[in-house]
Regions:
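A structural feature that tracks compact, well-ordered secondary-structure segments
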Residues: 216-218
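Nucleotide/phosphate-binding catalytic cleft detector across ATP-hydrolyzing
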Residues: 1-16, 20-207, 224-228
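Short, glycine/acidic-enriched loop or turn micro-motifs at the edges of active sites
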Residues: 14, 211-214
Length: 233
């Protein structure tokens, strides 16, 4: 029998911690193998205030999953939520390499490179860089600029930022349990992926996720996240 390869996600909330494990199916989708939820203390409005209490809850949930599946969890993706997660917009531009032949993928990549060089404030880190739209010669807004004729290609990106201290505390809590954090994802963007259709994202929709300590809000329009916020309760 072929050994399964598992993907683990850990969501540490203000009232409980959820550990979910999935495996890849033949059709490429992810099948859920186990989900365990345990009450948690030591977390307030998404921020770890007591690492021992939070760690004990994570340990209990992880141990139950390991017992159920007969595996040892050593790495996982994590979700994070709190008022320390926010979005900010940034606009930049490049001059196209060959205006006579239209925008090519290299021009778009050059614009992405400029956005990747944008630095967060010292106390924050950038989690996501999401293009909102493109402008050709500052006149016409387009969704895919490749093939458009212009000298100047501009774009506005939505940056999702997270405070470094809450992120470091989450990483520390997992490392104390021997779990390496492969990546971290804002919960405000994770929930819409589970509940929204592509048509809903296209037409415009807001998702409000009311949790035990915070409420996550995400607004989608024309297929991309336009705004995210986390409100402490």
């Amino acid at each position: 029998m072929e050994k399964k390869s598992y993907t683990v996600a850990i969501d540490l909330g203000s009232s409980n911690v959820v550990v979910a494990v999935g495996s890849k199916r033949e059709d490429g989708t992810l099948g859920i193998e186990a989900v365990v939820s345990k009450p948690v203390e030591g977390v307030k409005a998404g921020r770890i205030d007591n690492i021992e209490q939070a760690g004990n809850a994570i340990r209990e949930a992880v141990a139950e999953v390991e017992s159920t599946l007969g595996v040892r969890i050593t790495e996982a993706y994590a979700g994070i939520s709190g008022e320390f997660v926010r979005c900010a917009r940034h606009t930049d531009h490049v001059f196209t390499y060959d205006p006579q032949n239209g925008v090519n993928q290299g021009d778009v990549d050059a614009l992405f490179d400029r956005m990747r060089n944008v630095q967060a404030p010292d106390d924050e880190t950038i989690m996501e860089r999401i293009p909102q739209h493109y402008m050709v010669d500052d006149a016409e807004e387009v969704r895919n600029p490749v093939g458009s004729f212009c000298k100047r290609l501009s774009s506005t990106f939505n940056f999702i930022l997270c405070g470094k201290t809450p992120l470091q505390r989450l990483d520390m809590a997992l490392r104390r349990l021997g779990i390496r954090m492969l990546g971290v994802f804002p919960n405000a963007l994770a929930t819409p992926e589970a509940v929204l259709s592509s048509d809903e994202k296209e037409e415009g929709v807001a998702v409000v996720d009311i949790g035990g300590g915070v409420t996550d809000v995400a607004v989608y329009y024309r297929g991309v996240p336009r705004y995210v916020a986390t409100i402490p309760m």
